[in-house]
UniProtKB/Swiss-Prot annotation:
Subunit structure: Monomer.
E.C. no: 6.3.1.20
Protein name: Lipoate-protein ligase A
Keywords of this entry: ATP-binding, Cytoplasm, Ligase, Nucleotide-binding
GO molecular function annotation: ATP binding; lipoate-protein ligase activity; lipoyltransferase activity
Residue sites binding (R)-lipoate per the record: K134
Domain BPL/LPL catalytic: 29-216
GO cellular component, one term: cytosol
Organism encoding this protein: Shigella sonnei (strain Ss046)
Gene3D superfamilies on file: Bira Bifunctional Protein, Domain 2, CO dehydrogenase flavoprotein, C-terminal domain
GO biological process, alphabetically ordered: protein modification process
Lineage summary: Bacteria, Pseudomonadati, Pseudomonadota, Gammaproteobacteria, Enterobacterales
Lineage: superkingdom: Bacteria
Amino acid sequence: MSTLRLLISDSYDPWFNLAVEECIFRQMPATQRVLFLWRNADTVVIGRAQNPWKECNTRRMEEDNVRLARRSSGGGAVFHDLGNTCFTFMAGKPEYDKTISTSIVLNALNALGVSAEASGRNDLVVKTVEGDRKVSGSAYRETKDRGFHHGTLLLNADLSRLANYLNPDKKKLAAKGITSVRSRVTNLTELLPGITHEQVCEAITKAFFAHYGERVEAEIISPDKTPDLPNFAETFARQSSWEWNFGQAPAFSHLLDERFSWGGVELHFDVEKGHITRAQVFTDSLNPAPLEALAGRLQGCLYRADMLQQECEALLVDFPDQEKELRELSTWIAGAVR
């Protein structure tokens, strides 16, 4: 029986693909070498230790229906669209070696006619007249007995959209965690016009088989049929949850301020594990009572726009005469934390 396994996803759902990756990684025999090929529709993928409010323009993402997905490996934030090809190499120890998987990808690119080289710990670059340009970034994860190397190749990604979502909105955040480093990038189509995802997958597959001297049939993974993977439903539910994608952010503080016709408002939030642990409100309003009550209500609240809005509007019962002010406040807060 071959020790190789080749899986190809026909889903563009980042939560589905990352759940498949997680299940395969946890359950594979330590003697197996796995290649998983996939791609995501419009998604910002953040590292395990990153803060989405700090890394991303979450409001713009929501407006444009761009998903957020937290991966289980470290590293920085990246934007995926269908112009990216994603790959994951997995192996048990001591066979796991990220230099091997890197060389397989480089061999695949070379077979396609692209001369690339490794740069630093995570990137593959090509030389252009304007200098080195990144075409691939990677991240890694290791446990006691296994490891994986996953990354992307830029084929024909919409590079103009990187700045739309990976530059945070102008929010006053003081946050802990990993900050993404922006790199100079280029698409492979600049070097190989017309190159497709399927051609790149075929080249990586051939290089994978050539390295190990074996071949196996590809397994197509599809959301149309629930993958036959133990605990997949639970893993997918976690991967797609707000608690994982947003709530796992490192502790941070958020300062919001706005001036309304009825007074200025300054909100100070401390947030841990997606919950507000401390809320302070400062105002020069002539009637500060609703705002003081709001500070108490927000303690322990999920740091989610709809939940904050709900707490604001709940105060209408106790302060009906301040309906206009509370509705303005509610709309502003909901927009500010998206």
